[in-house]
């Protein structure tokens, strides 16, 4: 049969897990206390078989408000938030292999792309999709979700 494990993390603390020692067929749910306190209906990330799936991230400041300054500022803050989350999980931007960028206006694509490239090694750019859609959280101009390899 399957050797599976489900664990829940709040901050850095394991809340629930079973005795499985295999990383295959496992799901790890990762949330910060801030995410829980704000009542968001999703995990910040899940880890499945060594792959990190980050939920869509927008350019929020630590207090939860959206940064001012347009698409460039939002792109920088969004990617800074992604970088910080990966670092808390023991990873880095070099571990990202796929990004999906959702823009409220596709005309912002060139400026978003200029800022986006600053966060990655030019020799290791992740695969990427980008599209326009309306109704991003908090009226954001950009939302990015990523997949990364968990190295530890």
Model-inferred region functions:
Residues 2-80, 84-89, 94, 103-152:
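N-terminal presequence-like segments and the immediate start of the first folded domain
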Residues 97-99:
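Surface-exposed aromatic
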């Amino acid at each position: 049969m399957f050797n599976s494990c489900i664990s829940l993390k709040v901050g850095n603390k394991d809340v629930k897990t079973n005795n499985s020692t295999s990383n295959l067929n496992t799901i790890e749910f990762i949330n910060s206390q801030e995410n829980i306190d704000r009542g968001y209906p999703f995990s910040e990330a899940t880890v499945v078989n060594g792959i990190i799936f980050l939920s869509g991230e927008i350019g929020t400041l630590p207090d939860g408000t959206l940064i001012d300054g347009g698409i460039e500022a939002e792109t920088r803050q969004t990617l800074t938030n992604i970088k910080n989350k990966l670092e808390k999980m023991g990873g880095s931007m070099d571990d990202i292999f796929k990004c999906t960028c959702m823009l409220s206006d596709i005309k912002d694509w060139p400026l978003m792309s200029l800022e986006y490239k600053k966060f990655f090694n030019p020799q290791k750019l992740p695969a990427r999709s980008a599209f326009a859609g309306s109704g991003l959280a908090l009226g954001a101009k950009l939302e990015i979700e990523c997949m990364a390899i968990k190295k530890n």
